[in-house]
Each structure stands twice: as structure tokens, then as C-alpha cells.
């Protein structure tokens, strides 16, 4: 029957399923969606065109948000003199084990016909793991007076952190990101900036990625090295683990003192500036995959999808001209509609491959809406429509489809957010004892999905460390929206003034 054409499917397009082996399912979704692949360089990945279009959409949206909050883009060196990192002891300690170091500036032939390093550098150069130190040294030259402040700059760049256990998009030796670095005359202004930018990240995560997040403060042991305070957005993935999707750091005067960022105040005094930094990376794509995708492949929120609608013409040789004319006019009508204040992005897939193969190609890539049009549809004035999060496809009047395409995309965006929020709420608990804590986070097998988010009162972060390390759990954040009254520490039974979200994490 015509009504079954887009709904018949194998049991799942991705194997293994999430329940069978979540880590391997994640890797298979990336491959099936053609997002990225491993490179010849250990720990690095090749981001393929579909994945890079997705990253470009992330960039565009965030870049507009940064500029709307008064920030400008600039670019700073990839290489950082080792002496710059040594000026901020806590900072360098946090990154020392991950740094890639350049010690020579050329190659020369060796006697065996190969190449060897030559021209040893006077001072080793670090391939940036983050840019606070090199940017701070530049700001020290730019800032002389309070009139030079604030400085509000963002950089789109690549960074290197020599990870030993890598996973595409989540943890790679080289990754793409943005890092904002700002300088202020007062502590109050810098704190306001820190809070403003974590709110930008929350807005983007929830309204563009359709990914609900918890905004909170990191505890002292979890803060960014050298920061006075770190704010983060934390999301729950479908395996109930947490993923830190973005951070915003109030650096106090720590980096300005190390880098000599000083200015003359209105009163004529020489003062150290107050700085912030904040960033997100291609890790967001990993978060998006694990928040929404299913056992048939990638599921994309429409606001970030490279293509909103794909049209698959179905014809035999004698009907090709008629079908293609109809499909092209349908594409033009749909592209003239708007969704989220931008034109609907529509493509036609006229490749000479089997219809079923073509359908699953787009399902696995997460295209939000798939349309099929053949001679019978033209005669009836209808289009066969499949929406990515719906199990069945249906026929719909062409005029109705065109008139409601923006609404359908908006509905899908909201449904993805609602499903992710429900999943988080269904897997969030409050625990009051060590026994409950151990049971909640206990491993139930190599591939079993267990745990979730646990609200717990606690009184001393240091005393929790042996238990947390044993269970591979971390304190994700102290949520800023939490209005809980004083409670009892789940570990010691002593009075505790605050509570936090605990979870296993990426």
C-alpha cells in the first residue's frame, strides 16, 4: 500500500542499539550520519562536510549572540612560550599533562634517508591548550587606562590537549572551539560578564540545540585551573551521564597579575584588571548526538540542521519530466517559507539509487522532514511526508504542507526539547544516604545504562573524594536555581548548607 512506503524499515538502522552497547552505538551513529571519521593522526578526527555544516550552523548562531552582547572577533597565536604558562602556576598545573610541546623549528635529512628534528628552539613553544596566557600578554599592551576598558573579544580557533583516551567530538587531541576573553575595570563588571555568557550558552543549548541544561557553579576541586569561580551548563545524555556543554570563568585578578594587565583608574591609581574567559567546542555536536539520536541514526533539531527538508522524486522514465517539474516548484514554494526567522532550507535528492536506500540515507543523517513525490501524488495534489521523530509517514495536501512547514519544524524542535527534559526529570533523584548513593551509581554490567542525576546535600568536598573516585562519580555543579534549605550530608549525616548535582560524566 502507498501508505506504507516510507514507514517500512528494518528493526533498526543502527547496530548495536543504545540499550545493547551505548558507546558503540554513538560511534556507529557518527559513521552512519557521515559526520566524521578518524584521521591518520592518533586522537584526531576528520570532520566531514555534513558534520562541518552542522558546526558552521553552531558557529553562526553563537557568533550572532556574541556580537549582540557587544563582543568582537580576533585571532591570537597558536604557539605559547613556555614561560607564559609558568607565570600562572595553578593554570599550568591543570594543563601540564595535556600540553603538546614544540622544541625544534626545522627538519633535516638523517643518514638513513629519513628526517630528524633540527634547529632546537631557545625556548619551547606550547601548542595552545587554551589561550588565557598569550591573550593576557597582548592585553597587557593594549590596556593603559580605564578608558581602554572593557575589552570584549572572542576567538574561533583550534586547540590541542593531548588526550590519551579519545572519542570523536567528545574528547579529541585537537578540537575546534570558541574562547571569549574579556577585561574589566571592576570585579562587579567581570562577574556580570561571567553570568551573562553562561546565560548565552544556556539560551543556545535550550533554544537551538533543544537540549535542556542545568546552570550551576563548579565546586573548588572542579573549577577551571586559576579561576575564582566557574559556571557551567550541564546536560544529561541518554545513557544518563552528564556532559559539561559550556563553561564561563570569573578569573578575578589571577591572570592580570601574572600577565601585568594594569590600568590607571579614574582616581589616578594603578590597578590590576579583572578578567573572564568562556568557551564551547565541537563537543556540542557530541552532546547533540547523544541527546536526541535514536536507533535509526542521527536526529537533528531543525534550528541547527543543515537541511530542513529533503524531497525525493519517484518516477519512471516516462514520468521523469512531469515529476521533476512538480518537485522543483514544490522546492521553490517551501524555500519561500520561513522558520525561525530564516528561509526553510530545502534540497532535492535526485540521485540514481534505490528509493529505500535513499530514504535511509537521510534518516540516518537526521534530516528533519523527508518528502516523497510520484505521479500518483501529483494526480492527487498530495505529498508523502515523514518527520524524523515520528514512526510513520503520511500523505498531506500540498498546499497544507507549504502553509504549515514552518510550524512542523517548530513542533519538532519543541518535541525534541520536551523529550530530553522528560528523560532528565525521569532519571533525577534525591539521595540522603551513602547506601542510596552506592546503589544508584553501582555498575549493573558492562553495557547496562544506570544512574542519572542525584541531588545530594554535602558538607565537605574533600571528604567525598574516596567515594566519588570509587564509583567514578563527580560533582557536576551547585545549581544556581536551587533554593533548597539546609539539609543533612548524605555521607556523614552532619548538617549541610548546600546541595549539588552528582553524576557520572563524559
UniProtKB/Swiss-Prot annotation:
It is found in: Cytoplasm. Its EC number is 6.1.1.15. Its main location: cytoplasm. GO terms for cellular component: aminoacyl-tRNA synthetase multienzyme complex; cytoplasm. The keyword Metal-binding does not apply. One of its GO terms (molecular function) is proline-tRNA ligase activity. Keywords: Aminoacyl-tRNA synthetase, ATP-binding, Cytoplasm, Ligase, Nucleotide-binding, Protein biosynthesis. GO terms for biological process: prolyl-tRNA aminoacylation. It comes from the Bacteria. It catalyses: tRNA(Pro) + L-proline + ATP = L-prolyl-tRNA(Pro) + AMP + diphosphate. InterPro entries: aa-tRNA-synt_IIb, aa-tRNA-synth_II, aa-tRNA-synth_II/BPL/LPL, Anticodon-bd, Anticodon-bd_dom_sf, Pro-tRNA-ligase_IIa_arc-type, Pro-tRNA_ligase_II_C, Pro-tRNA_synth_II. The keyword 4Fe-4S does not apply. Consists of three domains: the N-terminal catalytic domain, the anticodon-binding domain and the C-terminal extension. Catalyzes the attachment of proline to tRNA(Pro) in a two-step reaction: proline is first activated by ATP to form Pro-AMP and then transferred to the acceptor end of tRNA(Pro). PANTHER family: BIFUNCTIONAL GLUTAMATE_PROLINE--TRNA LIGASE, PROLYL-TRNA SYNTHETASE. Homodimer. Belongs to the class-II aminoacyl-tRNA synthetase family. ProS type 3 subfamily. This is Proline--tRNA ligase. It comes from Rhodopirellula baltica (strain DSM 10527 / NCIMB 13988 / SH1).
Amino acid at each position: 500500500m502507498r501508505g506504507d512506503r516510507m514507514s517500512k524499515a528494518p528493526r533498526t538502522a543502527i547496530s548495536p542499539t543504545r540499550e545493547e552497547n551505548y558507546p558503540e552505538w554513538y560511534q556507529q551513529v557518527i559513521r552512519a550520519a557521515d559526520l566524521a571519521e578518524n584521521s591518520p593522526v592518533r586522537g584526531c578526527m576528520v570532520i566531514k562536510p555534513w558534520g562541518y555544516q552542522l558546526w558552521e550552523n553552531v558557529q553562526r548562531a553563537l557568533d550572532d549572540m556574541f556580537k549582540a552582547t557587544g563582543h568582537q572577533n580576533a585571532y591570537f597565536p597558536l604557539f605559547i612560550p613556555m614561560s607564559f604558562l609558568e607565570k600562572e602556576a595553578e593554570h599550568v598545573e591543570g594543563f601540564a599533562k595535556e600540553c603538546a610541546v614544540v622544541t625544534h623549528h626545522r627538519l633535516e635529512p638523517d643518514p638513513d634517508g629519513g628526517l630528524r628534528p633540527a634547529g632546537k628552539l631557545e625556548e619551547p613553544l606550547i601548542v595552545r591548550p587554551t589561550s588565557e596566557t598569550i591573550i593576557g600578554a597582548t592585553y597587557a599592551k593594549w590596556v593603559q587606562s580605564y578608558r581602554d576598558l572593557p575589552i570584549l573579544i572572542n576567538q574561533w580557533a583550534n586547540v590541542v590537549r593531548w588526550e590519551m583516551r579519545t572519542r570523536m567530538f567528545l574528547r579529541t587531541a585537537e578540537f575546534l572551539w570558541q574562547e571569549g576573553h574579556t577585561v574589566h575595570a571592576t570585579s562587579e563588571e567581570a562577574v556580570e560578564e561571567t553570568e551573562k555568557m553562561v546565560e548565552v550558552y544556556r539560551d543556545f543549548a535550550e533554544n537551538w540545540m533543544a537540549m535542556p541544561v542545568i546552570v550551576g557553579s563548579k565546586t573548588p576541586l572542579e573549577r577551571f585551573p586559576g579561576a575564582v569561580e566557574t559556571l557551567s551548563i550541564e546536560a544529561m545524555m541518554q545513557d544518563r551521564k552528564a556532559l559539561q556543554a559550556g563553561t564561563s570563568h570569573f578569573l578575578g585578578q589571577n591572570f592580570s597579575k601574572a600577565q601585568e594587565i594594569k590600568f590607571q583608574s579614574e582616581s589616578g591609581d594603578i590597578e590590576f584588571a579583572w578578567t573572564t574567559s568562556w568557551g564551547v567546542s565541537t563537543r556540542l555536536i557530541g552532546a547533540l548526538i547523544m541527546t536526541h539520536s535514536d536507533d535509526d541514526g542521527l536526529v537533528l533539531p531543525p534550528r541547527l540542521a543543515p537541511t530542513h527538508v529533503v524531497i525525493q522524486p519517484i518516477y519512471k522514465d516516462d514520468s521523469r519530466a512531469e515529476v521533476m517539474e512538480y518537485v522543483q516548484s514544490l522546492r521553490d514554494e517551501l524555500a519561500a517559507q520561513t522558520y525561525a526567522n530564516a528561509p526553510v532550507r530545502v534540497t532535492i535528492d535526485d540521485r540514481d539509487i534505490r528509493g529505500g536506500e535513499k530514504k535511509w540515507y537521510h534518516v540516518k543523517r537526521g534530516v528533519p522532514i523527508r518528502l516523497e513525490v510520484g505521479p500518483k501524488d501529483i494526480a492527487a495534489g498530495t505529498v508523502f511526508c515523514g518527520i524524523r521523530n515520528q514512526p510513520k509517514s503520511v500523505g498531506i495536501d500540498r498546499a497544507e504542507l507549504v502553509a504549515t512547514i514552518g510550524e512542523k519544524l517548530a513542533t519538532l524542535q519543541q518535541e525534541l526539547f520536551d523529550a530530553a527534559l522528560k528523560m532528565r526529570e525521569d532519571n533525577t533523584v534525591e539521595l540522603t544516604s551513602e547506601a542510596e548513593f552506592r546503589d544508584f551509581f553501582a555498575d549493573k554490567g558492562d553495557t547496562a545504562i544506570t544512574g542519572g542525576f542525584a541531588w545530594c546535600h554535602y558538607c565537605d568536598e574533600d571528604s567525598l573524594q574516596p567515594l566519588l573516585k570509587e564509583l567514578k562519580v563527580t560533582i557536576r555543579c551547585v545549581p544556581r536555581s536551587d533554593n533548597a534549605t539546609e539539609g543533612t550530608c548524605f555521607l556523614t549525616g552532619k548538617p549541610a548548607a548546600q546541595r549539588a548535582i552528582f553524576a557520572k560524566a563524559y
